[in-house]
Amino acid sequence: AFAFFAPLDLRPLPGLTIELSMSLPAGAPSDAVACFVIPQRRIIVLRYEPFSWHRSWFGLAADKRLYRAVIAHEVAHAIVACHAGEPRLSFAAQEYIAYVAMIATMPEEHRRELLALHPGSGFDNVVQINEFAYAFNPARFAAESYRHCIRQPDPRAYLRRVLDGGVIQGLGGY
């Protein structure tokens, strides 16, 4: 994930830790396999064994390729949390960036498999990129976010604008 964000001139995060754990902290959604604890700059990822108990995630087998993708997603959240512009990014913008990074860093064959499981052409406009779309179907949100981003004339510059705030608004305009 750091290599993915390098062209955006984002530096490694001092003090960022990745912890492998048999469980996630209390309050994490029951279907979550990882989380980022912002104040502590700590990524907590299920160890591979409990991760694999999920059998599948987004329709893909819970294998080592997907495990790496999940870690890339959480590292993207950490980068976003530490480099986002003000005001704080909306939840939808944070997930958009994290899923674009996750899918973009997957091996090509794995990425094609994920996208085939969740067909579409990408969001038509930024108004469609919102918390409702995410809550209704996170896997589709992920695939449509990636497709939307790569359709941009300069996807990296577009991600930089999203990261700087103002492109993807949350519900209620923030």
Residue ranges of model-derived segments:
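Active-site recognition of the HExxH zinc-binding catalytic motif
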Residues: 69-82
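Solvent-exposed loop/turn segments at secondary-structure junctions
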Residues: 24-25, 49-53, 78, 85-87
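Post-HEXXH active-site segment of zinc metalloproteases
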Residues: 65, 81-103
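Surface-exposed patches in mature extracellular/periplasmic domains of secreted proteins
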Residues: 6-20, 82-91, 110-119
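Auxiliary, metal-adjacent structural segments of Zn-dependent hydrolase domains
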Residues: 1-48, 61
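Long, well-structured alpha-helical subdomains associated
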Residues: 108-174
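Short pre-active-site segment immediately N-terminal to the catalytic Zn-binding motif
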Residues: 50-71, 89
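Stable alpha-helical elements in mature extracytoplasmic
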Residues: 1, 63, 67, 71, ...
